[in-house]
Amino acid sequence: MTTGRLGQRAVPPNAAYAGQVVHFPDPVRATRHPRGVRVDEHGYPDFSLYARAVAEIAEPPEGFGVDELRLTDYVSANAALAASGHELWDTVPAVATPHGWTWHHAAGGRRLELVPVEVKALLRHHGGIATSTVDQHKRGTRPLQETRPVHFALPKSAVAVTEQQVQGVEEDLGYRLPGAYRSFLKAAGGSAPIGTALDAELGLLIDQPFFTVRDEAAVNDLVYVNKCLRDHLTKDYLAVGFVQGGLLAVKVKGQGLGSVWFCAYDDARDVDPAWAPADRVERLLLPAGGDFDQFLGRLAGNPPELETVANLMVDGGFARSVPVPSAAAVGE
C-alpha cells in the first residue's frame, strides 16, 4: 500500500519560501491580513496566527484513505467545537463549518486549525494531510445508505445574480460561462447548502457559500477571487467556490467545457516543481461532474452518517477542542 509517508519525504510545493513570510498579493487580503503567512524552515505554511479554533484528532485507523481522513477530520473537528460551545457554531449544524472558515491540518501531527478561507488559499502547500500515514491513492468514502437532495438558502429576490451582472462578468473574463453553471450562478450565487452537502465519491464536505458577483472587490466575488487563485488553477478553469480541503472549479476553455473539478489543497501528489501549471492541473484535479447539473446531482444533503461518525469521534474522546494559541490574531 502506498501511504502518506511518501509525502513526509517529498519537498512541499512552494518550499522555496521556507523561512520567509509570504504576503498576500491582492489589496483586499493584504489590507485584511497584513502580517501574511510564515512558511517554516521545512516549507510548510504556519497558519496558527489566524486560528480562531483548534481541534486535535486521534490517528486514523489502518487502511484509511485520504478522502476518508479529510471528511472524518472536518466533521469531527466541527462537532468537537460545537460541543465545546464555541460561538461560531451558534448558527450552523454541529458537523458544518462556519461560513468564511476552513480547517487546516498542521504538518506532522493531528492538529486542525480553523482559519479564514481566503488565508488558506494563499498558496499551494503541504500540511498534515500530505504528511499523514493514510493511503494517499485510495479515493472516495463509504457509500451512503440513502441520499437526499441538497437544498440551498436562496435569496428572497427573484434571482441571486441578474443577467446584466452575469454579462458583466463574462465581459471581464472574456468568455461566456458554461450553461449549467451560468444558470446556477443566477439562481444561487453567494448561497450555501442548507446545513451540509456531501460528494461521497470524493469525500467533499460542502458547507460554504459559492462565489457570487459583487459591485466591489471582495474575496467572494467571482472575478476578483479568481485573480487570487492563479497558484492553484490555470485560466482554463474558473474557481466557483471554496469547499473544505480545496477549491471547486469549472472548466471554461478547451476540451470538457463546463465540467466540474476538485482542486485539493495539501495534496501529497503535488511534488514535482518541474511540472508546468497546465501539466499540474491535468495530473492533480479530480473530476466531480460532466457539468454543474451533474455535480449538483452527486450531492447528498445533510447525510445522517456525518453526524453519526462525528458524534462517535467526540463521545469516544478521539476528537476534542483545544485552546487557540495566544498569538493568534485574525484579521489584524
Where are these regions (language model features)?
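A surface-exposed partner-binding patch
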Residues: 145-247, 322-331
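Nuclease and nuclease-like effector domains acting on nucleic acids or nucleotide cofactors
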Residues: 1-102, 106-148
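Acidic, proline/glycine-rich low-complexity IDRs
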Residues: 135-138, 142-146, 292-332
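Compact, glycine/acidic-enriched structural inserts
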Residues: 261-298
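Short, surface-exposed beta-strand/loop "edge" segments at domain boundaries and coil↔beta transitions
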Residues: 63-65, 141, 246-249, 267-276
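A short, compositionally biased micro-patch
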Residues: 109, 243, 253-255
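Short, surface-exposed beta-strand/loop micro-motifs that present aromatic residues
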Residues: 104, 239, 247-253
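Conserved, surface-exposed functional patches that form binding/active-site neighborhoods
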Residues: 248-268
